[in-house]
Amino acid sequence: MLEEDSKASDRLSQAVAGAPIEPGRSPSLGQTVLPPEQTIDLAHLARMACGEKSLEAEVLSLFDRQAGMLLARMQQSSPKVAGDFAHTIAGSARGIGAWKVAAAAEGLELAARDCDPARFARAHRRLASTIAEAQAAIRALLAVR
């Protein structure tokens, strides 16, 4: 069990650092990693919403708004507060299966603790990029529902 925890910790560290992770596994929760072109894990989303399409649409819409709002607030916040916002985004992203957003948010959380402005700025740009990707995917998904 301890060895499995160590491997999971290593995968999380690799993902946060932007390094490749073990194929077929997510960096933090052991879920399957999707091909790069797939931004939202639709199977995970369906499981979380118990197959309710209206609930899936609702949580996707909520994530879209929340992530955009928190990202905007980060720009006027201290690194500590931005890290707290990133923590919220990471949890929400995991809920809808937006694994790249979750990993980027975890990276920003860690960068916020480092007192390294350059690393923090890179992590913020990465998070903004992955959120924009997820928002585009969400809008496309909602348009066909």
Residue ranges and their predicted role:
Residues 38-88, 95, 119-142:
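Long, amphipathic alpha-helical coiled-coil segments characteristic
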Residues 93, 111-112:
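Eukaryotic all-alpha helical interaction scaffolds
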Residues 1-31:
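C-terminal compact regulatory domains
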